[in-house]
């Protein structure tokens, strides 16, 4: 398929507003890359520059070693799927899928072959004669995917393709897109603001904020080793807890509570003696007392529950630790109650520390 290279790419609009800053990324052949971040972070703008729908203000973009900055969108061998299905309402499913191929003067036989092959892969062959209005949202999205598949393009670009679907259908379509990628092997860049989509679908994730790349890595790398406060707080649900405290002589102190820091962190924190830092701990790494194995460093503390949300197999607890807001995921067997205090254990092998000024993880 294709390898992509974006080198020092910027996007500056005519009003001098810069949307993307020094974007650098190497995409391997057949890789599934997800751009994730909040609205306005530059992820869709970057995707549109790759597609040729936005001009690159500075830097270079290559496909298989060929510079693409000045190549017309139609000549980039890229297929794109948008948030909107963008189907022609007066055309049948077959006609919608065949439309782009007709414009490119493919033979009737080749068009028929490609449309039926894509329809078979997407399991929409029974609907080829129907109009879009007769289809469900999921079926319409499959038609939009099929229109891209028939192109046999080197690169697939997907701009929030599932955001118009309900929660149950999004889960189903996530799985279908992953399976589709495995079957056709196209190099794919997928844009979303949904961190669940990013974590479950990507080979690698590009986390963006304010036009800058915050971190690039596999879902596991980013989840376990977030580069900064933003990444730690953005990926994972509920979000990572952040607790401000002071590091002194091997202890992290929050008000009148002291947590003894494991030796593996102390060398990293040696230059922060007596300084205020931020500790990050994910809700799933707070457990009922006695749950953490003795082989792992841990700390016990009293947790004042304000709200207890039962999700069947677990509770999401919202409360405070020495006056600072925290959230914990605990097994439903604990049967915690709102406006009560329980003992929780913090798995200290899973904590992170962040610099107060730079907000970067302390390594």
What are the residue ranges of the model-derived segments?
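Short coil-to-beta microelement around the adenine-binding A-loop and adjacent beta1/P-loop entry
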Residues: 16-18
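Pre-Walker A (P-loop) beta-loop-beta motif of ABC nucleotide-binding domains
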Residues: 23-34
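The feature captures the beta-strand-to-loop junction immediately N-terminal to the Walker
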Residues: 36-38
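Helix-to-loop junction immediately C-terminal to a conserved catalytic motif
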Residues: 51
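ABC nucleotide-binding domain "signature motif"
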Residues: 57-67, 213
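ABC ATPase nucleotide-binding domains
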Residues: 73-230
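Glycine/charge-rich catalytic "coupling/switch" loops of P-loop NTPases
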Residues: 249-306, 325, 335-363
């Amino acid at each position: 398929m294709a390898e992509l290279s974006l080198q020092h790419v910027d996007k500056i609009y005519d009003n001098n507003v810069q949307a993307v800053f020094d974007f650098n990324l190497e995409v391997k052949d057949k890789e599934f890359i997800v751009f994730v971040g909040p609205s306005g972070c530059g992820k869709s703008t970057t995707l549109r520059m790759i597609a040729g729908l936005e001009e690159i203000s500075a830097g270079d973009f290559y496909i298989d070693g060929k510079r693409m900055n000045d190549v017309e969108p139609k000549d980039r061998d890229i297929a794109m799927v948008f948030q909107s299905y963008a189907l022609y309402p007066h055309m049948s499913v077959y006609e919608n899928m065949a439309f782009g191929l007709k414009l490119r003067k493919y033979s009737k036989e080749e068009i028929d072959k490609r449309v039926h092959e894509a329809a078979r892969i997407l399991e929409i062959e029974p609907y080829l004669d129907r109009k879009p209005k007769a289809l469900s949202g999921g079926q319409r999205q499959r038609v939009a995917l099929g229109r891209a598949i028939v192109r046999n393009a080197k690169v697939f670009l997907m701009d929030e393709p599932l955001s118009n679907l309900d929660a149950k259908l999004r889960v189903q379509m996530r799985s279908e897109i992953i399976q589709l990628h495995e079957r056709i092997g196209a190099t794919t860049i997928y844009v979303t603001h949904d961190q669940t989509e990013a974590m479950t679908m990507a080979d690698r994730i590009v986390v963006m904020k304010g036009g800058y790349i915050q971190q690039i890595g596999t879902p596991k790398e980013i989840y376990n080793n977030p580069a900064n406060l933003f990444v730690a707080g953005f990926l994972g649900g509920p979000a990572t807890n952040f607790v401000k405290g002071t590091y002194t002589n091997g202890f992290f102190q929050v008000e009148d509570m002291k947590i003894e820091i494991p030796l593996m962190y102390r060398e990293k924190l040696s230059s922060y003696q007596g300084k205020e830092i931020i500790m990050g701990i994910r809700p799933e790494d707070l457990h009922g007392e006695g749950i953490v194995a003795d082989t792992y460093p841990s700390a016990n503390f009293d947790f004042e529950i304000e709200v207890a949300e039962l999700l069947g197999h677990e509770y999401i607890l919202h409360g405070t630790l020495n006056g600072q807001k925290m959230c914990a995921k605990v097994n439903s067997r604990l049967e915690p109650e709102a406006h009560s205090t329980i003992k929780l254990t913090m798995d200290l092998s899973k904590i992170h520390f962040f610099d107060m000024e730079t907000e970067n993880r302390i390594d």
